[in-house]
């Protein structure tokens, strides 16, 4: 049976059973590629990126030895999405005012006037 690329897509997280070769995704049964915030809705700093990548690696390691089907990929994507919301709510991440569309998909930003 031929293997095909699996993917999980949320608003801010895309995960593929693939690796990037010459700027193209190529199926790989033992590798996952994370595409984070493809619409550039957030302003990322090194610390928040580090936390996301660390969480992604932890989630993958927890599933070591198991088949990574689309259900497992969705669970990983949902947990990473939850961490993004946590970082945003704690002020470790902010919305990008230059984003194509400002829809505050994870809630209105917290400001001193709203606190």
UniProtKB/Swiss-Prot annotation:
Major enzyme class: translocase
GO molecular function terms noted in the UniProt entry: oxidoreductase activity, acting on NAD(P)H, quinone or similar compound as acceptor; quinone binding
Mode of membrane association: Peripheral membrane protein
Gene Ontology CC annotation, any one: plasma membrane-derived thylakoid membrane
Disulphide connectivity of cysteines: none
HAMAP family noted in UniProt: NDH1_NDH1M (MF_01352)
Family the UniProt entry places it in: Belongs to the complex I NdhM subunit family.
Complex and partners: NDH-1 can be composed of about 15 different subunits; different subcomplexes with different compositions have been identified which probably have different functions.
PANTHER family: NAD(P)H-QUINONE OXIDOREDUCTASE SUBUNIT M, CHLOROPLASTIC
Official protein name in the record: NAD(P)H-quinone oxidoreductase subunit M
């Amino acid at each position: 049976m031929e293997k095909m690329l699996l993917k999980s897509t949320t608003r801010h997280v895309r995960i593929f059973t693939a690796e990037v070769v010459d700027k193209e995704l190529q199926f790989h049964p033992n590798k996952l590629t994370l595409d984070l915030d493809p619409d550039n809705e957030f302003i990322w700093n090194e610390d928040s990126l580090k936390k996301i990548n660390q969480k992604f690696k932890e989630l993958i390691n927890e599933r070591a030895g198991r088949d990574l089907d689309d259900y497992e990929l969705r669970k990983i994507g949902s947990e990473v999405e939850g961490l993004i919301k946590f970082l945003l709510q704690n002020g470790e991440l902010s919305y990008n005012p230059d984003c194509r569309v400002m829809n505050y998909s994870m809630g209105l930003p917290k400001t001193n006037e709203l606190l």
